[in-house]
């Protein structure tokens, strides 16, 4: 009678889970959260988060086939990232029929290798109390705004993402970016720059 009846949310690396883990997870009320960040090896290497994409794909298919709720999170604003490479990461997630895709802006934590090397990539941060990377040598601020719009359209369509990338991008162009999703005081600082956003 004292069995746990709640729901578990477990953060996992997709390439690290085993068939045994998937078997037992399928017997629980569980949601798996996979921090993918990016499908691109150069971007992953820059933040010490390279993925074995073959294994990632195999395991996500197994999780889906087992009927386990799951989501994938990615990051925009990564070193060496571009608008095009970010879109390719999103396209991969859509092709895998991930039910919930979440895209978060990169925050540089003080003392990390990425923060120490930020000038190597020309990373520029916003000027608020919880700064995020908004520009680099490989993406402009306008590119970042368009990545933010894609992030917003993913938020707006959770559990019902369009199957086609083109439809998601169209929704992104129509989205109003809610910057305060990530930090409560960002809206007043960052929202005026949305006037600079361009269509993809």
What are the roles of these predicted feature ranges?
Residues 77, 104-111:
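Short, solvent-exposed turn/loop segments enriched in Gly/Ser/Thr/Pro and often Arg
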Residues 25-39, 99-107, 117, 123-126:
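Non-cysteine beta-strand/loop elements that form the S-adenosyl-L-methionine
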Residues 144-200:
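Radical SAM enzyme core and accessory elements
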Residues 119-163:
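Alpha-amylase-like alpha-glycosidases and glucanotransferases acting on alpha-linked glucans and related
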Residues 1, 84-99, 158-176:
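Short, electropositive alpha-helical surface patch
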Residues 19-25, 79-97, 143, 147:
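Catalytic cores of alpha/beta
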Residues 1-71, 76-78:
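Conserved SAM/AdoMet-binding glycine-rich loop
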Residues 1, 48-51, 88-89, 115-122:
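Short secondary-structure boundary/capping segments
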């Amino acid at each position: 009678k004292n069995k746990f009846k709640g729901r578990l949310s477990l953060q996992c690396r997709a390439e690290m889970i085993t068939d045994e883990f998937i078997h037992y997870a399928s017997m629980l009320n569980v949601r798996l959260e996979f921090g993918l960040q990016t499908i691109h090896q150069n971007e992953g290497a820059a933040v010490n988060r390279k993925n074995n994409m073959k294994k990632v794909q195999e395991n996500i298919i197994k999780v889906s086939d087992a009927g386990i709720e799951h989501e994938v999170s990615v990051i925009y604003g990564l070193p060496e990232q571009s608008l095009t490479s970010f879109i390719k990461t999103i396209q991969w997630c859509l092709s895998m029929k991930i039910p919930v895709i979440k895209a978060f802006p990169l925050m540089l934590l003080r003392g990390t290798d990425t923060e120490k090397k930020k000038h190597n990539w020309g990373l520029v941060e916003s000027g608020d109390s919880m700064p995020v990377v908004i520009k680099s040598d490989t993406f402009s601020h306008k590119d970042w705004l368009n990545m933010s719009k894609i992030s917003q359209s993913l938020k707006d369509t959770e559990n019902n993402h369009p199957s086609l990338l083109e439809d998601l991008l169209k929704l992104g162009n129509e989205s109003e970016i809610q910057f305060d999703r990530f930090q409560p005081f960002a809206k007043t600082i960052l929202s005026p720059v949305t006037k600079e956003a361009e269509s993809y």
